[in-house]
């Protein structure tokens, strides 16, 4: 699950696809910071990732899915199915761990 390099690529891909310059993020980030993210020199916090995605008008999970699955719709479908299964399993485990009154 190596997505660190892919996150940089996904960020740049979405930014360019949306026709946004690095300067378009000036309300949430400097152009220099955007450049360091896109060159994989730094990793954003979850909060910063959400702010960047808001500028690009996408959900952070969309960006992360692109980072993990790349351009493959099949890989994206498999990843999203895995996430759904894991969320269901966590919910069942949480419910099973609740004390009964």
Identify the meaning behind each predicted range.
Residues 65-101:
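Short, charged recognition helix plus adjacent turn
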Residues 1-17:
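A short, Lys/Arg-rich alpha-helix, primarily the initiator
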């Amino acid at each position: 699950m190596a997505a660190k390099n892919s996150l940089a690529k996904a960020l740049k891909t979405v930014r360019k696809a949306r026709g946004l310059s690095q300067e378009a993020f000036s309300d949430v980030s400097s152009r220099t910071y955007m450049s360091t993210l896109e060159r994989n020199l730094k990793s954003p916090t979850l909060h910063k990732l959400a702010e960047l995605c808001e500028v690009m008008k996408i959900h952070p999970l969309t960006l992360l899915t692109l980072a993990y699955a790349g351009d493959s719709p099949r890989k994206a479908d498999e990843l999203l199915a895995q996430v759904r299964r894991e969320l269901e399993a966590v919910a069942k485990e949480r419910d099973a761990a609740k004390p009964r009154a």
